Design a protein with these regions (language model features):
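Bacterial N-terminal signal peptides
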Residues: 8-16
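Acidic, polar-rich low-complexity tracts and alpha-helical solenoid repeat scaffolds
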Residues: 2-5, 18-264
């Protein structure tokens, strides 16, 4: 009885495999299968309506004509089709395909495109400030590779804009953490985070906030002398900031305070 069941399963699996093989064989007629260009164009027909079927054609180009001009285009088309589907799983597959393309064809005219799109794979799935920023960091790394490896390309220009956006997001994230420490009266931790913004993200658009809360962290930490440069910077460079008046009030408060007696 057991032998009969096993035999039945083997026959069943064989029929399924034969069926799948027949479908693959029937995927492209001989006149298409014998041409790299025809296979590629056949794949293009299905990219939007049946991306999985399109990828079968593209992979047939890659496997059957590995040194063809269309093999490189097919490799990118596979990556782009995964990217276009947009969900987490397909974006991971897209990133893998782009990375492999760059590894195989580093001097290809399409390499800058693949590198930039690799950055987008992480950028498009990155979280808002206040949440895990690992994907933003990965995106920033890949965009920086774009401008380093391909500095004169259009993709480098696009990457520079994305770098600014990534750094703005990371700065805002760091500020959110610093503000949390400030409100928790953990002033040593808040100053550390806020100084990190000054050091790593000097173009952050919320720099007036950084100067105020950095100054006020030192002020509340009983280090008023260290707060003066930051309050002064805020008042001088951002006079229209909503925090400028508070910074000015702090400076007056520090000025009126009796000098601290130093021990001899």
């Amino acid at each position: 009885m057991k032998k009969s069941i096993a035999l039945f399963l083997i026959i069943g699996l064989g029929l399924v495999a034969a069926s799948c093989g027949a479908k693959k064989a029937a995927l492209a007629p001989p006149e298409v299968a014998s041409s790299d260009e025809a296979l590629f164009k056949e794949g293009e027909k299905y990219v939007k309506k049946d991306p999985e079927r399109a990828r079968l054609f593209f992979r047939q180009v890659i496997d059957s004509f590995p040194r063809s001009f269309y093999a490189q285009r097919a490799k990118l088309a596979v990556a782009d089709s995964y990217f276009a589907e947009g969900d987490e799983g397909n974006i991971i597959l897209a990133a893998s395909e782009y990375r492999e393309f760059i590894s195989l064809h580093p001097l290809s005219p399409s390499a800058p495109y693949a590198q930039y799109r690799l950055g987008l794979c992480f950028y498009d799935k990155s979280a808002k400030p206040g949440r895990d920023q690992q994907k933003t960091i990965q995106a920033l790394t890949e965009f920086k590779k774009t401008i380093t490896a391909y500095p004169l390309t259009e993709e480098a220009k696009l990457a520079r804009a994305k770098i600014k956006e990534c750094e703005e997001r990371l700065a805002e994230h760091t500020f959110t953490i610093g503000l949390h420490y400030y409100r928790s009266e953990a002033y040593k931790a808040s100053t550390s985070r806020l100084i990190d913004i000054l050091t790593n993200y000097p173009e952050y658009t919320g720099m007036d906030k950084v100067y105020f809360y950095l100054g006020d962290s030192y002020f509340n930490w009983q280090k008023a002398d260290q707060s003066i440069p930051y309050f002064t910077k805020l008042v001088t460079d951002y006079p229209k900031s909503k925090l400028a008046a508070k910074a000015e009030a702090r400076l007056k408060e520090i000025d009126k305070a009796p000098p601290v007696k130093t021990k001899k």
